């Protein structure tokens, strides 16, 4: 257990510091019971020790935001916090600085690059607000995994701790501007589900209109297509084709066989119904004389 701070006989380890930050982020109400709740979440610490540690933390955050000290380099993903590199508290945390250097010696270069104290951008802070609205305080792992994917859960917890300290700070007129002053994402409710993409409904309506207009209506048939109207036409009497050259003028049944009582040359009464255009019907026996082609004689 690494020693982080010794003041008035109280020893703050890294685990105590993390528990303090989480309890501080979960209890933001301005009441005397707030410090008792925080002390209950940090084992072995009294209310007076919690208040003293809070005052030191506020001082550290104020100096970092004022630009007096450079941004800190996080010692490890599990124990990074916003005030680990404060020069004002370096005398109190001398043992922690040496322990952090020895721990970083065995780490790879990629891990060190990922843990560098890069300042939060405004877009990351807005994503943090969206995740805070959905998951609430304390679920920093879900916020890091689903919203602020560029930050670790511990970095999100540290950012939340500084954000709530900024909200509860009493010297609001004297402090510098910061992204922590952003408390909402626009004027819209972040929990409202998004509607369809603009133009999607119009394209769907146009496709439906084109599909409806593509099938022409048959006169007297409502919305039925011409193909359906032809297939549903009532059957009429047998239809006869035109006589071919060299064959008798007697017609030949085209679609339906002739009834038994119907003979060639007998005129049948016209029956109303739909017929195929161009086909002759109800034609009796007609003689047809084949004209002879004159041949040339030599």
From Swiss-Prot:
Low complexity compositional bias, start-end: 201-215
Induction of synthesis: Induced by salicylic acid (SA) and gibberellic acid (GA). Triggered by dehydration and salt stress.
Skewed-composition ranges (Basic and acidic residues): 108-118
Subcellular location: Nucleus
Main location per the UniProt record: nucleus
Expressed in which tissues: Expressed in young seedlings, developing leaves, sepals and trichomes.
This protein's name: Transcription factor SRM1
Organism: Arabidopsis thaliana (Mouse-ear cress)
